[in-house]
C-alpha cells in the first residue's frame, strides 16, 4: 500500500508502461525498464525510509551495572559501536543497516503525515475513551508535589509490566534477574495537598508530544528515567510504528513516527565537557571536567521541545573535583577544587546556555533533583543490614531527615540554578526526599555487572555487588515521570515552569 492520501503508484506506473507499449514507439523491453523506474520513483519515500531507518537487535544494549555512577554500555556490550541499534515495537528483529553519524535521523526529517492522515488520526484520538470521557490533567502549580507519603496500591500499580516492555535493559529488570518480591512496584506517591493522576494516559501524553521531541540529558539516573518513560508511553504506540535507535551510546532515541515524535536520552554525566563523555570508555578513575565548556553537548539540545536535565551521581566519588585550567590544552592540565564550587560553576554554565539558547515560547525545561543512594542501613534503623540488600518496603513512620549522605548543598545549588536562567522558566522537579524513603526500590543484587546478570555467588555478596544507586523498573522513576506528566499536561504547551 502507499502512504495515506496518495494515489496507487503501482497502478500509475503500469498505466504509463502500457501506454508506451500501445504507442508502438518503443520496444517491449524499454517499456519494462520504464515500468521498473516508475515504480522506484513512485515508492521513493517508502524505500528511503526502509533503507535508512531500520536495523535489528534482539534487545537494547545493556547499561553498566556497577554501583558508583556506571552508566552506559561498555564497548563489548554494544551490538555495534558504529551502527544504530534498532528495535521495533514488539521486539521483532529488523534488517540491520549501517548508518553513519551524518545520517542521524531528526524529527524534522521524518515523514510527516499528510493532512488527510493527520485529520484521521486526530479524529481517532478525539473518539478514544479517555478523551471522549473528558479526561484532563489539572494539577495546580501551587501544589508542592514533593511533600506527601507512599501509599501501597496494588490495584493501579505497577503502571506497566516488566515483561511487557521490551525497551527495558537488563540493568533494571529486577524480577527477570531473580528478585522474588514485587511489592516495590506497588507504591503510589500521594502528595499532601493535592493529587497526582492515578494513571499515566499514554495517548493523552503522546498527543501533547505530537510533532515534538522530549529529551532526557545527564547521567545514568536520567537514563533510568528515560527507560521508565518509554515504557509508560508504549501503550499509545501502534505495532510497527515505533523503533529505538542507539547512536554510539551517546543518544538513545525512541521514534514514534505515527506521532512524528521522539523520546530521547543524551549521555552527558556532567552536562559540561569531561574526559568521561565517551560512552564506550567512560569508566575513568580520574574524572576531569571543563566547567565552562558546554557547546560540544549543547548543540544537540537546540530546538528540543521538552528538556529534562540532571547531574549528580558522577560527582560523588571524591570531595574535590579536577577542573581543566582556563589555559589548559589537555586533560592533564587541571587544578583540584571543592566539589560544590565546581558544581556551581557547571550549573552557572548550564543556566547561561539555557538563558541564551532556549526559546521559552517553544521549549519547556526541567531539572531533576538529586536521586539518593541507600548504602547506610543504620540510617533507617537497620544496623544489621548490608547496603540496600533485602529491603522490601519503604521507610515508614519516620519523622525528621534521613542521613543517607545526600549532598544537600548540591541540591540547593541545582534548585538555585534552575531559578537563575532568568528569561527561560525552569521547573525544578524535587524527587529527593520522597525517594530517600524508598530503600526498597534499588536494583541491589538483581542487576548486571560488565554486561552480565550477577551470578548466585555475586548475589550472595551484597557488600561488594549491591547497586544502591539505580532503580528497578517498574518502580520509583515511574513516579518521577508521573510528576513530569502532571506538570506538562496541566499547562498549555510551552507554558512557564515552577517548582514541582
Curated annotation (Swiss-Prot):
Basic and acidic residues bias: start-end ranges: 91-102
Superkingdom of origin organism: Eukaryota
Keyword Glycoprotein: yes
Chain ranges for the short sequence motif GDS motif as given in the UniProt record: 218-220
Short sequence motif DXXH motif: positions: 467-470
GO cellular component terms listed in the entry, alphabetical order: Golgi apparatus; Golgi membrane
Subcellular localization(s) per the UniProt record: Golgi apparatus membrane
One GO molecular-function entry: O-acetyltransferase activity
Membrane topology category: Single-pass type II membrane protein
Sites where a glycan is attached: 144, 154, 260, 416
Keyword Zinc: no
Keywords per UniProt: Disulfide bond, Glycoprotein, Golgi apparatus, Membrane, Signal-anchor, Transferase, Transmembrane, Transmembrane helix
Stretches in topological domain Lumenal: 44-500
Biased composition (Basic residues): 103-116
Enzyme superclass (EC): transferase
Residues passing through the membrane, by range: 26-43
E.C. designation(s): 2.3.1.-
Disulphide linkage map: 143-194, 165-231, 174-472, 388-468
Cytoplasmic side: 1-25
Functional summary from the UniProt entry: Xylan acetyltransferase required for 2-O- and 3-O-monoacetylation of xylosyl residues in xylan. Catalyzes the 2-O-acetylation of xylan, followed by nonenzymatic acetyl migration to the O-3 position, resulting in products that are monoacetylated at both O-2 and O-3 positions.
PANTHER family per record: PROTEIN TRICHOME BIREFRINGENCE-LIKE 9-RELATED, XYLAN O-ACETYLTRANSFERASE 1
Family (UniProt): Belongs to the PC-esterase family. TBL subfamily.
Protein name per UniProt: Xylan O-acetyltransferase 2
Species of provenance: Oryza sativa subsp. japonica (Rice)
Lineage summary: Eukaryota, Viridiplantae, Streptophyta, Embryophyta, Tracheophyta
Amino acid at each position: 500500500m502507499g502512504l495515506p492520501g496518495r494515489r496507487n503508484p503501482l497502478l500509475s506506473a503500469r498505466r504509463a508502461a502500457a501506454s508506451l507499449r500501445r504507442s508502438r514507439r518503443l520496444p517491449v523491453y524499454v517499456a519494462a525498464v520504464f515500468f521498473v523506474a516508475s515504480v522506484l520513483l513512485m515508492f521513493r519515500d517508502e524505500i528511503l525510509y526502509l533503507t535508512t531507518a531500520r536495523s535489528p537487535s534482539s534487545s537494547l544494549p545493556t547499561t553498566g551495572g556497577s554501583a558508583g555512577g556506571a552508566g552506559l554500555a561498555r564497548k563489548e556490550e554494544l551490538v555495534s559501536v558504529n551502527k544504530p541499534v534498532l528495535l521495533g515495537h514488539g521486539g521483532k528483529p529488523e534488517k540491520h543497516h549501517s548508518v553513519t553519524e551524518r545520517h542521524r535521523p531528526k524529527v524534522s526529517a521524518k515523514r510527516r503525515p499528510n493532512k488527510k492522515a493527520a485529520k484521521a488520526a486526530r479524529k481517532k484520538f478525539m473518539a478514544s475513551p479517555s478523551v471522549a470521557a473528558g479526561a484532563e490533567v489539572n494539577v495546580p502549580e501551587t501544589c508542592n508535589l514533593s511533600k506527601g507519603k507512599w501509599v501501597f496500591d496494588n490495584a493501579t500499580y505497577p503502571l506497566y509490566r516488566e515483561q511487557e516492555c521490551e525497551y527495558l535493559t537488563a540493568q533494571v529488570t529486577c524480577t527477570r534477574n531473580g528478585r522474588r518480591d514485587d511489592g516495590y512496584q506497588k507504591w503510589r506517591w500521594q502528595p499532601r495537598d493535592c493529587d497526582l493522576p492515578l494513571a499515566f494516559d499514554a495517548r493523552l501524553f503522546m498527543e501533547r508530544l505530537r510533532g515534538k521531541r522530549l529529551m532526557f540529558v545527564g547521567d545514568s539516573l536520567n537514563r533510568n528515567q528515560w527507560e521508565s518513560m518509554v515504557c509508560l508511553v508504549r501503550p499509545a504506540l501502534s505495532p510497527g510504528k515505533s523503533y529505538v535507535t542507539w547512536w554510539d551510546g551517546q543518544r538513545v532515541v525512541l521514534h514514534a513516527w505515527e506521532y512524528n515524535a521522539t523520546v530521547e536520552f543524551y549521555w552527558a554525566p556532567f552536562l559540561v565537557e569531561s574526559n568521561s563523555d565517551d560512552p564506550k570508555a567512560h569508566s575513568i578513575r580520574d574524572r576531569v571536567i571543563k566547567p565552562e565548556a558546554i557547546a560540544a553537548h549543547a548543540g544537540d539540545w537546540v530546538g528540543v521541545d521538552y528538556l529534562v536535565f540532571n547531574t549528580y551521581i558522577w560527582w560523588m566519588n571524591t570531595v574535590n573535583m579536577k577542573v581543566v585550567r582556563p589555559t589548559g590544552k589537555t586533560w592533564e592540565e587541571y587544578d583540584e577544587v571543592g566539589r560544590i564550587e565546581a558544581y556551581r560553576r557547571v550549573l552557572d554554565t548550564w543556566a547561561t546556555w539555557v538563558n541564551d539558547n532556549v526559546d521559552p515560547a517553544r521549549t519547556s525545561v526541567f531539572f531533576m533533583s538529586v536521586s539518593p543512594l541507600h548504602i547506610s542501613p543504620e540510617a533507617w534503623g537497620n544496623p544489621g543490614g548490608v547496603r540496600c540488600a533485602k529491603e522490601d518496603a519503604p521507610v515508614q513512620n519516620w519523622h525528621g531527615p534521613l542521613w543517607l549522605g545526600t549532598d544537600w548543598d548540591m541540591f540547593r545549588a541545582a534548585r538555585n540554578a534552575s531559578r537563575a536562567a532568568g528569561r527561560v522558566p525552569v521547573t525544578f522537579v524535587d524527587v529527593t526526599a520522597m525517594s530517600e524513603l524508598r530503600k526498597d526500590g534499588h536494583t541491589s543484587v538483581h542487576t548486571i555487572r560488565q554486561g552480565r546478570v550477577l551470578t548466585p555467588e555475586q548475589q550472595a555478596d551484597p557488600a561488594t555487588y549491591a547497586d544502591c544507586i539505580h532503580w528497578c523498573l517498574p518502580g520509583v522513576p515511574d513516579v518521577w515521570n508521573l510528576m513530569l506528566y502532571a506538570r506538562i499536561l496541566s499547562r498549555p504547551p510551552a507554558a512557564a515552569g515552577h517548582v514541582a
